[in-house]
């Protein structure tokens, strides 16, 4: 079975209370073909110190981590784009988004995702499912029609949430100017997850999209860091 390389993108802003749990959930995975790209978006608390302390304590993992410290805030979408420009990523490598205040809920998360991609080589993207910190029901549901993403979600709302992964080859084909910038040429400063996933899903189509109904992601929707609660309405 093919063992895909994962690039885990972890974006942080003032999440010192949660970042250790996030990183611990990565290094305890039973799958070891991965690299972690951490971008701290100019946190004003002790997030960066917590990250460096963790990496010093687990220094045998240091070659798998790349910590980038922004000197000024750029916003989630700009950070997502930046994260995929700092490594030499190959077409079939898998990108996984794990926010700094969230965590993977089981040590086999990467193994399960890899197995599904290996068994379904034509699939290019996956999403769902998660456990909510507030106990709210997950919004993730299977995509059950061949109509476009925009048409499908119009009556039911957004359903493509954590746990989100995609093959890098899909990312290369996005029209980034059209997808990520407004009419004035300014990058969207909010709802980065939606801005990224929507064009990827449109490119892949339903038949090359996987839905996981196993909850492999713990989503802290009760923090001030939660992008969906704070900013999604701005998109």
Please give the residue ranges for each predicted region.
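Nucleotide-sugar donor-binding/catalytic module of glycosyltransferases
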Residues: 2-235
